[in-house]
């Protein structure tokens, strides 16, 4: 975004608030496809599921030339004939042009939001706000807060029934009318195009592979609208707590001057005082926390089960009356934290209870006190990861490693490097797991799948190939953090293996979820 701001400073003229002219600038398309801008230190890109993100500058120039032709978009808008519409799809709705236009449009829409975000952190004087972008920054927050809470509610945020609802939300944020017309035209025609090939039961609009960036931005704007009203009602309940029950008592005594009703009035005031205290405390819950990633949200509270049900029906009614679509109540589950583990961001999280007996000595008497401590625990979802590995053709459904035939044509170093990067990415992302032994099974599957792929390429057996390579193959699957931790623990404490298995590390520059973890979450 800093590079984009530099380009925008050069193009500032009389049309500072217009985004439509940026459609004819080549550098916008270059920035839209520069995936290195969103890279991370501990994320090494590797193609796992076969996505192709290649771009061509010559095709971009050809696209801009076609857009300059005024009858290009007008003829598509006025055309209602399906046969003629299918003629236009050869150019405008081909896979490449649809992708580059949508991702470039997403760049335009991100401009006002990015400026607002930077100004917000500048006003709040938050120096290292980039660390807040990390996915791992959520887990230290959960470690501090969840141990004091009682109930957790898992919310699966529904997708709007019509894609036009997503576009209407941006009308209040963007003032460029031509750009809004272009966005509305693109969304409507994209909806019509997909309706020719995709059934009504599949909602593919938000997580479309071809238009991932645009629909992710539109969906986040829709979720921001939901969370804005959630924060609004949360603040309103906070202000209700400011109505003091003591003031209610004084006013009651002031207006009631009849001496004969004094005893009954005092009883009435005590009842009202207790009732109002409970009611206002019910509306204002200081121990409520909300965390979201993509469509999955977690709402945790220290209140009662009845309070969580009220928030549940608030969400259902809000989606129904504000966004005009029905939300299924079973999408929101309410569970007690003491005996429940929830899946969030690639981890199974739960609260572990540890009982501790403490002997207390008072003068000549001594007695035991049983204390219970709660600890936030995170574990690797082994079964879900194995299912994701089976989809990527690394193993069977039962977890038996198999070869990767599509990579058999690569060189030996490339094959080992690809498997090693996948293994290191998983190790970095799941570095916060309390039991590293669960991750060793995933590493074993990848390591043996790599050996089977190499053996298939050289038409040999796995045992023969491993004897020839020796320990060189295993070194590629070790991460830097494991080597550093083994070095540190070997110098500081004799319990090297014990400490390395239980040490949890959260990285503050992992800004994207691992592909294998993401696919296991969506499955």
From Swiss-Prot:
Localization: Plastid, Chloroplast
Keyword Chloroplast: yes
Annotated GO CC locations: chloroplast
Gene Ontology terms for molecular function: RNA binding
Keyword Chloroplast: yes
Superkingdom of this protein's organism: Eukaryota
Gene Ontology process terms (BP): mRNA processing; RNA splicing; tRNA processing
Pfam families assigned: Intron_maturas2, MatK_N
Keywords of this entry: Chloroplast, mRNA processing, Plastid, RNA-binding, tRNA processing
Family: Belongs to the intron maturase 2 family. MatK subfamily.
Role noted for this protein: Usually encoded in the trnK tRNA gene intron. Probably assists in splicing its own and other chloroplast group II introns.
Name recorded for this polypeptide: Maturase K
């Amino acid at each position: 975004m800093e590079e984009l701001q530099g380009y925008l400073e050069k193009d500032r003229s009389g049309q500072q608030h217009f985004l439509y002219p940026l459609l004819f600038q080549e550098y916008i398309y270059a920035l839209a496809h520069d995936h290195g801008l969103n890279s991370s230190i501990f994320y090494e890109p590797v193609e796992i599921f076969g996505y192709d993100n290649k771009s061509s500058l010559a095709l971009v120039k050809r696209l801009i030339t076609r857009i300059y032709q005024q009858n290009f978009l007008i003829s598509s808008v006025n055309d209602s004939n399906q046969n003629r519409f299918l003629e236009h799809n050869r150019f405008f709705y081909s896979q490449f042009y649809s992708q580059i236009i949508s991702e470039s449009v997403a760049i335009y829409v991100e401009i006002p939001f990015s400026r607002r975000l930077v100004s917000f952190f500048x006003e709040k004087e938050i120096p290292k706000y980039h660390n807040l972008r990390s996915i791992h920054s959520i887990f230290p927050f959960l470690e501090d807060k969840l141990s004091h809470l009682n109930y957790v509610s898992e919310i699966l945020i529904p997708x709007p029934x019509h894609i036009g609802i997503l576009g209407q939300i941006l009308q209040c944020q963007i003032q460029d009318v031509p750009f809004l017309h272009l966005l509305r035209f693109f969304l409507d025609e994209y909806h019509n195009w997909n309706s020719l090939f995709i059934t009504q039961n599949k909602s593919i609009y938000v997580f479309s592979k071809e238009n991932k960036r645009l629909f992710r931005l539109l969906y986040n704007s829709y979720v921001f609208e939901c969370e804005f009203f959630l924060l609004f009602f949360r603040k309103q309940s906070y202000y209700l707590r400011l109505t003091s029950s003591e003031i209610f008592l004084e006013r009651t005594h002031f207006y009631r001057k009849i001496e004969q009703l004094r005893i009954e009035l005092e009883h009435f005031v005590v009842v009202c005082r207790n009732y109002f205290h409970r009611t206002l405390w019910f509306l204002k819950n200081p121990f409520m926390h909300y965390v979201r990633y993509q469509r999955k949200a977690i709402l945790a509270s220290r209140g009662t089960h009845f309070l969580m049900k009220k928030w549940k029906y608030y969400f259902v009614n809000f989606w129904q009356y504000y966004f005009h679509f029905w939300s299924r109540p079973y999408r929101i589950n309410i569970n007690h934290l003491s005996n429940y583990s929830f899946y969030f961001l690639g981890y199974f999280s739960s609260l572990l209870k540890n009982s501790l007996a403490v002997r207390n000595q008072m003068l000549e008497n001594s007695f035991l006190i049983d204390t219970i401590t709660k600890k936030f625990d995170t574990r690797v979802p082994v079964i879900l990861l194995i299912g994701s590995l089976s989809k990527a053709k690394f193993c069977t459904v039962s977890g038996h490693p198999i070869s990767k035939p599509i990579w058999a044509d690569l060189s030996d170093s490339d094959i080992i490097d690809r498997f090693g990067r996948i293994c290191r990415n998983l190790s970095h992302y799941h570095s916060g797991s309390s039991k590293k032994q669960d991750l060793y099974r995933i590493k074993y599957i990848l390591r043996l799948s790599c050996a089977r792929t190499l053996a298939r390429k050289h038409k040999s057996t796995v045992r023969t190939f491993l004897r020839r390579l020796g320990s060189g193959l295993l070194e590629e699957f070790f991460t830097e953090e494991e080597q550093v931790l083994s070095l540190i623990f070997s110098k500081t404490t004799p319990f090297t293996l014990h400490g390395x298995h239980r040490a949890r590390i959260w990285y503050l520059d992992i800004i994207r979820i691992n592909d294998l973890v993401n696919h296991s979450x969506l499955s």
